[in-house]
Amino acid sequence: MASLDSHVLMKLGSLFLSTLFVSIVSSESQCRNFESIISFGDSIADTGNLLGLSDHNNLPMSAFPPYGETFFHHPTGRFSDGRLIIDFIAEFLGLPYVPPYFGSTNGNFEKGVNFAVASATALESSFLEEKGYHCPHNFSLGVQLKIFKQSLPNLCGLPSDCRDMIGNALILMGEIGANDYNFPFFQLRPLDEVKELVPLVISTISSAITELIGMGGRTFLVPGGFPLGCSVAFLTLHQTSNMEEYDPLTGCLKWLNKFGEYHSEQLQEELNRLRKLNPHVNIIYADYYNASLRLGREPSKYGFINRHLSACCGVGGPYNFNLSRSCGSVGVEACSDPSKYVAWDGLHMTEAAHKSMADGLVKGPYAIPPFDWSCLSSMIKKKEVVGNTIFFDE
């Protein structure tokens, strides 16, 4: 009888500790009413920074039609036909679209600020250039973070106010790091050589998060990489007659997708380490890899055509892509219905694909751990945002 009582007590003690642990974790991931979005990254989140930084004689392709045609009805500097993932997240939160920091005339950054620049890398461009990887500019993650810190007096004034602003913001960390791999892959560098960059990229992202935590950051959305083997550009560049290199279900290159998985796995391991070191901080992994891959596995389920590996805007070849005649060039037209396509220009996605990706993040299951929006539902229903339309069901 005594042994049974002891067993019961142990069970009760275990249950108490488990309940206590869940309560502690839940309290740290409880619903928060974000007052703004602070964004870093590359073209996946760039809402116009590269355009604002560019000389009028050397504008990016995103400055020309048909970019922006679907929603804004004119080019905005976004590398898509319309809105990006960050735009749909802003809509869901009832916030205005996050303005680019560069090139904004009388920009209002009270509800958000975006430092993401197309073609940006995680690692410093000088480091990559030394390895022989050409970078078009140096707006690495470190540079973006430095500019953010320099801008704080104008953004929020006093240090205490800035700490509050950062603490009440959803901080979007990318996607960043893809170009660190894209540039050498475009130069046909060996896989093992590119793989050596992964720990350096992960460490750089981790250091940036740690620095922002020290500045008061409490909630981070950290995207992983995309399935590079499904990129129209890489499918064109690495085209082969060996069908064993392709996934029979998606048509994507298996070896490149495995590389993307490796990056995402390493990033998740590092985020787990950061969570243990900072239990008061909510670090959410955005599974861009699987949120994107599902569109290739079952395109018709999500409203896309079965030829999901064909660019909407492009010309030539089996994937409607030619790097020397890219979208935005004279004579290169877009498809009649971009909403049926996953790929926009061979390197970036359509607005429809971005909406599906964002939907998978804010409503799960591609946010790990998932967001808790319980305190936002009534607010979002009541809030009116001029020029924005909320597409997510409550």
Curated annotation (Swiss-Prot):
Residues the record marks as active site: 43, 345, 348
GO cellular component: extracellular region; plant-type vacuole
Known EC number: 3.1.1.-
A GO molecular function held by the record: hydrolase activity, acting on ester bonds
Domain of life assignment: Eukaryota
Principal EC category: hydrolase
Database matches in PANTHER family: SINAPINE ESTERASE (PTHR22835:SF678), ZINC FINGER FYVE DOMAIN CONTAINING PROTEIN (PTHR22835)
Entry protein name: GDSL esterase/lipase At1g31550
Organism the protein comes from: Arabidopsis thaliana
Lineage, broadest ranks: Eukaryota, Viridiplantae, Streptophyta, Embryophyta, Tracheophyta
